[in-house]
């Protein structure tokens, strides 16, 4: 079973992915909790490149092309899929990922790239059984992001977040595996909503 948690910055993806993994573990499932960019050498390189103000920070929309950025993330994802996700699913594990190719579609589409090209670029990526989209108003997103000590360059502009949120909602209409959860609720309520979805959509099949 493969579940992905998506949403704009500040939506609480990492927290909810962790809570869901803990819920599955308590039920006796073997769980793999992962994220994108990954913790591989390639993923760490990308993560470092995305950090604002870093000496090696190149992804600012000026120093490399948006196409190159999309290809970098897709390359990390290819490693992720072939070395972790597919092998884990093959052995019957539950895989939960904090972000996946939907993030690339939402963000890079917001940067002006063609959606169909982005979908084709990520066609190798195995489709999840369920994608939880944590939907958060941009105003609340910016409030939460501003409280962080480290900001990625994706966090800089509210206008980008607005486009990304709109794109996520459009993607939810296109991809049948996506379900929307209100991320303005409390952490506990959001977790309960996700568990209810998992039980309804996956465990009772």
From Swiss-Prot:
UniProt key word Nucleotide-binding: yes
One Pfam family matching this protein: Thymidylate_kin
A Gene Ontology cellular-component term: cytoplasm
E.C. number: 2.7.4.9
PROSITE patterns for the chain: THYMIDYLATE_KINASE (PS01331)
Reactions catalysed according to its record: dTMP + ATP = dTDP + ADP
Entry keyword Electron transport: no
GO annotation, biological process: dTDP biosynthetic process; dTTP biosynthetic process; dUDP biosynthetic process
A GO molecular-function descriptor: dTMP kinase activity
Name of this protein: Probable thymidylate kinase
This protein's encoding gene: tmk
